């Protein structure tokens, strides 16, 4: 009986082990810079350091390919203007939902929350977006994104 009880506790304890996803430190660093730049509406940093050309945006009903830095910059300016009109304040990452690395390619999903300027939650408490990253010249950049909610709301 004691043995059965011990095995039961061991089994229950194993079910509660955290499955926290650990990402490559270079990916983590890039996302810290990305989330800060996004929260600051810093389209220059995102255009020049975070997104790569071409950049693919996979929406629910279409795919948008941004073929130049100028296209990316214009897309970001339009997006940040819409966010500003919706009283957007900032975003925080809550967790990584998934992470897969294959040499110079990464597929990662980020769970995040957006806040209004008064620090109340903007829209859904938890949002997700999936990203395709490519390592080029020693650094990761985002080459594609699948937003699972509307980007500017």
Tell what function each PLM region has.
Residues 71-118:
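Surface-exposed, charged secondary-structure patches
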Residues 124-153:
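Short beta-strand edge/turn micro-motifs at domain boundaries
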Residues 50, 61, 110-112, 146-147:
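A mature extracytoplasmic/lumenal domain signature
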Residues 3-13:
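Sec-dependent N-terminal signal peptides
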Residues 14-49, 58:
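Short, low-complexity N-terminal intrinsically disordered segments enriched in polar/charged residues
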Residues 34-38, 42, 50, 54, ...:
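Sec/Tat-exported extracytoplasmic proteins
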Residues 34, 46-47, 54-55, 72, ...:
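Hydrophobic pocket/interface hotspot
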Residues 55-67:
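A short gly/proline-enriched turn/hairpin at secondary-structure junctions
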């Amino acid at each position: 009986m004691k043995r059965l009880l011990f095995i039961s506790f061991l089994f229950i304890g194993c079910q509660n082990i955290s499955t926290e996803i650990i990402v490559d430190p270079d990916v983590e660093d890039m996302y810290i810079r990305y989330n800060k730049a996004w929260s600051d509406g810093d389209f220059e940093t995102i255009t020049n350091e975070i997104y790569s050309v071409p950049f693919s945006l996979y929406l629910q009903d279409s795919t948008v390919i941004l073929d130049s830095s100028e296209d990316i910059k214009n897309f970001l300016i339009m997006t940040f203007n819409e966010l500003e009109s919706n009283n957007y304040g900032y975003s925080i990452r809550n967790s990584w939902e998934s992470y897969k690395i294959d040499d110079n390619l990464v597929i990662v999903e980020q769970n995040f929350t957006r806040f209004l300027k008064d620090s109340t939650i903007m829209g859904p408490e938890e949002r997700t977006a999936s990203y395709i990253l490519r390592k080029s010249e020693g650094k990761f950049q985002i080459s594609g994104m699948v937003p699972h909610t509307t980007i500017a709301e």
